[in-house]
């Protein structure tokens, strides 16, 4: 399944496909330096799948949790890119949930005033919501998302297969946003939760949730109201 976020020159494709993680290199140029940002909650096999497609992949695996959205970790990513000679033609790839996406996206927005950002969400909530829209940020002085930027990815690849490794509680909790979206704007999506096993229909759930998020972003990219 494929969607296109239509934002003029900042438009990009959103791919929802089982096995999509192994095809990222077919969808966007990875024949360059790629900072692959992940955390300890992401299976190592996913990281290896991405790195195998990169000509010069530079992995950074951070601690799992909200504390990673810090000035310290942000600086760490920028320093690694500088030490490896990243230029504006290179890329940052987020492999993880919303925390990884927020942090990696802000690093991509900031390094040399912006490098290519690729988002490969691996949690339920990030696949159905936070991976698109361009909001990137870190926390500062105990306040969430104080410092950040609107910076759209060049590609989003949501591979539902990556959700199979999540604890069941985390998988179910992440679906709350999809249930809310169904109640508000998509009766068919809501009915999926009443009649189907969410695991069996997860690709459709992700797709239909992102359709609604995409429509909101296209109308009001920067939440101007």
Regions found by a protein language model. Name each.
Residues 98:
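Acidic-aromatic/histidine active-site loop/patch
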Residues 15, 106-198:
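A glycine/threonine-rich phosphate-anchoring loop and its flanking beta-alpha core
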Residues 1-91, 200:
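ATP/NTP phosphate-donor binding region
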Residues 75-78, 176, 180, 190-191, ...:
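Predominant activation on well-ordered alpha-helical scaffold segments within soluble catalytic domains
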Residues 19, 72, 170-173, 188, ...:
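Conserved active-site and cofactor/substrate-binding residues in soluble primary-metabolism enzymes
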Residues 196-225:
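Active-site segments that bind and position negatively charged phosphate/pyrophosphate groups
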Residues 101:
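Catalytic nucleophile loop
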